[in-house]
Structures are given as C-alpha cells and as structure tokens.
C-alpha cells in the first residue's frame, strides 16, 4: 500500500517525509484503518467466494419464486453506502441523536415519493417507512390498533394467506405468534372456485366481531375485492388492513386494483414486485374516520399510534441505507418503464399459466390475474417438495406451497411460481413457454425417480432424502440442468447492460 502511494505521488519524497509516511502507515495498520479500506475479496476471500458463487447461481438459474426480484444498481449503490453508518432513533425533525440533517432529508423524500407513487393526499394519508420487513410491519400495525387478546381475521395460510395474518393449525397449535398475541380466526376460499368466500366471511365476521380484518395474500392468484372487504369490515365495526406486499408494484403501475380507496391501513414489503430493497411501509389514514347518526365526526388517530408502535414500541434505530435505497426504488416505480415492466409481468403470468395448462397442469382458481400462479400437483402423482427439489437441481428456483385442503406445509400438493424476476431479466411469452416445458419435463423425471424410492422407507423425511440422492446422481437431471444454465445465462442481470 505504502509503495503504491510513493509511486503515485506527484513529486519525490524527501527522506524525512518518507520516514513519516512509513510511521503513519504503521500506525494506521496497527489500529485497523487499512483493514477498513480493503475490499472483501482482499480481506475475506472465503466470504467473497460464497458471494461469487451466489452471483453465478442467480445468473445461471431461472428465478420463479414470486416474492423474489432483481433490484437495480442504483438501489444497490445506496444499500452499500455511508447511509448505513448513522444512528437515527426517532423521526425527521425529532431524533434522539445529532447529525441527522441529511438522514432526515432522505427519509422525508422517501415518504413523499411513497405517497405520490400511489396518488395519496398527504392531508388524508401518512406513511411510515422504518419497518424492517413485512411481517414486523404487520405486527406493528396490529399492535397500534389492538390490545393483546383482541380479535382479528385473515386468509388461512393453506388457502393463500400469510403467516403474519395470524396462522394457527386446526388443532389449535399457534404457528404464528400473532395468533398468541391476538385471537385469530381464518377465512377461506370456496373449494369449488378457489376464490375468497366473501359470503361466509361476512357471516362469520358478524359472529366473531374482529377488531381487524386483513385483506392480503401470499399465494392467491386472483384480484381481491377490496370494496366487498370494506363492506364486511363496516358491518362488524372492524378496521380493514390491506397487505399488498405481493402486488404493490402492480398497484403502483396501475395494472392491479388499488386497496387504498377502501382501506384504513395498507402495509407492503418493498422488495417483491416493487423491486426495491428489503424493507416495508405502513400507510395509514388521517382525518375523518366516520360520522355518527347524530352527526358527530369520529377522527382517525392512526398517525401517532402507528408511528409509536414502530418506534419506540418495537424498533430502535431505523436502517437508513434501506430507506434511502427505497426512495430510489420509488422514483423508479414512477417511470413509464416501470409501468411497461409491470404490464409485462401480468401478461407473462397469463401466458405462463396457459402454457402450463396446455401441458396438463391444474391451476388453483383456474388461472391468474396477478404475477403468480399456484399449481395443484395432486393429479400428477408428485408433491411440491419433490418438484421443488428436482427443479433446484435443474437450476430453476420455485417453491413448494400449500393449497386448499393440504395438511402439511413440509410436503404440500402445490408449487408456487411467478414472473417478476425473470421479466426483469427480459423474459417474454416465448421464454415462459419454454420454462413451462422445463417444468413438465421435471415432473416426468421426478415421477421416475420417486418410483425408485425404497418401499420399506416409511418415514416421509427418509423417502425425500432418497429422492434428493437420486436427483443428484441422475445423468438426465445433470444434462438438463446444464442446458437450463447455459440458456438463462444469456439474459442479463441488472448491472450488465
């Protein structure tokens, strides 16, 4: 390091200057300053090797997990920036640390862009951008408007809901701690249609009297009827909290109905279809909530309650590098290019579904209105765990998923796939048709390998372990995996253009 500096100097150093430079370099080395300026490949080759392998995996594999995406170089610039060095407990203009004038600017800009992106009047809506991720954001929102033991309703997990909506098993085992903090009751889809059963929800909510109804999904391919949710919530006196984590990018681009018109609170992650950093936002109404029969105006008080729930009730200092990166992503989401991207995401999903259906796959609800599809594998003689396993071997990342009627999340009957990530990389209808063909081939291979499992292996975990070994040893799987990797590697990831 010192020699390089001597050579790049604009003039020759005197003996005294050289000696002092050596002494200063030694001092910096002793207290670790030189280490702090090293790049990861220089200081930690082991970790850099892992990073390199993950980069290669992303480049040479097909990403179908609908909650994943490839964020932009500009977002990555902020995530690895000096913005992460600052502590800033509190909110803009009300911090518990000094030196936050530029952090305040970044967070305020992020809030402004969030409201503008969704066409929200700052007099009627506010937004908190400090939540670290989606599940915590939901907890913070619930805690702001409920006491421990209050009641809430959310879509059942096997029917397309999310853990953070209060999932518990039919036997009463509380899987999500949300169901320990609050009394939760699930609503479900109609088995005949695969669509939310609003009529049953309407009746049960009048009996259960929840304080919150959650309109949100993680594996539901159809548009939610937010107006109907509002009517149901009003009939039982509940808040309507819409969790648009999966579709926030689609909503921003206007290719999916917006929940804001009908909701009291809207939560979302920021890294799925919105294509930003891994974070979350909580939007909340301000102003008049309702007017009584006597003409008395009942005002919202969500502003203070939600902000207090985030900090100091649940979190300390926010992640300023994430908030700054989110501000960039929100600016990107307001562009015509982003709208074109989201239009393609939805169109690709429809084509993908059609191509899968042509090959005999059954889709829960019969298709999709969004970015994702839920495949029912039960008629095909294979389960989601085995198909996920062999697809991973084939350099295709998808995820096993429960479908209505499933009793096990470890060995479910469904596979969840989506189009956001590969649409980012340039996939269109033709490419997703080819992916459907790969999945079809994977099912055939999986059925053949499953037939080789020992008949005396009664334990499901043991049988799956045998299946994984067969996948690793299969020459057919290896050959197809190389074909997939070589093909998808031709499509750029952000930063390569």
From Swiss-Prot:
The modification N6-(pyridoxal phosphate)lysine is found at residue 272. Its cofactor is pyridoxal 5'-phosphate. InterPro entries: PyrdxlP-dep_Trfase, PyrdxlP-dep_Trfase_major, PyrdxlP-dep_Trfase_small, Ser_HO-MeTrfase, Ser_HO-MeTrfase-like, Ser_HO-MeTrfase_PLP_BS, SHMT-like_dom. Its main location: mitochondrion. In eukaryotes there are two forms of the enzymes: a cytosolic one and a mitochondrial one. Belongs to the SHMT family. This is Serine hydroxymethyltransferase, mitochondrial. It comes from Eremothecium gossypii (strain ATCC 10895 / CBS 109.51 / FGSC 9923 / NRRL Y-1056) (Yeast).
């Amino acid at each position: 390091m010192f020699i390089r500096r001597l050579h790049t100097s604009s003039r020759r150093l005197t003996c005294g200057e050289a000696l002092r430079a050596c002494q200063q370099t030694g001092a910096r080395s002793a207290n670790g300053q030189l280490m702090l300026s090293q790049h990861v490949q220089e200081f930690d080759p082991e970790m850099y090797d892992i990073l390199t392998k993950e980069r290669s995996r992303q480049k040479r594999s097909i990403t179908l997990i609908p909650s994943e995406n490839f964020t932009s170089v500009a977002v990555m610039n902020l995530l690895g920036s000096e913005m992460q060095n600052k502590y800033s407990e509190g909110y803009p203009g009300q911090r518990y640390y000094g030196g936050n004038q530029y952090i305040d600017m970044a967070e305020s800009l992020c809030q402004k862009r969030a409201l503008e992106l969704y066409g929200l009047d700052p007099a009627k809506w506010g937004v908190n951008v400090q939540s670290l991720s989606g599940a915590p954001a939901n907890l913070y929102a619930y805690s702001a408007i409920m006491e421990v033991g209050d009641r809430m309703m959310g879509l059942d997990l096997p029917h397309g809901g999310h853990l953070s909506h209060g999932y518990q098993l039919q036997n009463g085992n509380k899987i999500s701690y949300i169901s320990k903090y609050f009394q939760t009751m699930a609503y479900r889809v109609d088995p005949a249609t695969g669509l939310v059963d609003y009529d049953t929800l309407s009746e049960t909510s009048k009996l259960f009297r929840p304080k919150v109804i959650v309109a949100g999904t993680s594996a539901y391919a159809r548009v939610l009827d937010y107006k109907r949710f509002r009517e149901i919530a009003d009939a039982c006196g509940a808040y309507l909290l819409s969790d648009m984590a999966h579709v926030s990018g689609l909503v921003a681009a206007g290719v999916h109905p917006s929940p804001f018109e009908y909701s009291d609170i809207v939560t979302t992650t920021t890294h799925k279809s919105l294509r930003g950093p891994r974070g979350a936002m909580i939007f909340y109404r301000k102003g008049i909530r309702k007017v009584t029969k006597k003409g008395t105006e009942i005002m919202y008080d969500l502003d203070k309650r939600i902000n207090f729930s985030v900090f100091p009730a649940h979190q300390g200092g926010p992640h300023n590098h994430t908030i700054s990166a989110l501000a960039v992503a929100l600016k990107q989401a307001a562009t015509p290019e982003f709208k074109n991207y989201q239009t393609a995401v939805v169109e690709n999903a429809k084509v993908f579904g059609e191509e899968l259906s042509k090959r005999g796959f059954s889709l829960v609800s019969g298709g999709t209105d969004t970015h994702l599809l839920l495949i029912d594998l039960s008629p095909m003689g294979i389960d989601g765990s085995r198909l996920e396993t062999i697809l991973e071997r084939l350099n295709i990342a998808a995820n096993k998923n429960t479908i209505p009627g499933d009793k096990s999340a470890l060995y479910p009957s469904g596979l969840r796939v989506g189009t956001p990530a590969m649409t980012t990389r340039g996939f269109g209808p033709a490419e997703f048709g080819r992916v459907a063909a790969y999945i079809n081939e994977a099912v055939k291979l999986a059925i053949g390998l499953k037939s080789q499992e020992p008949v005396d292996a009664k334990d499901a975990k043991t049988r799956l372990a045998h299946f994984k070994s067969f996948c690793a040893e299969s020459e057919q799987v290896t050959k197809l995996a190389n074909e997939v990797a070589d093909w998808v590697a031709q499509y750029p990831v952000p930063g390569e253009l």
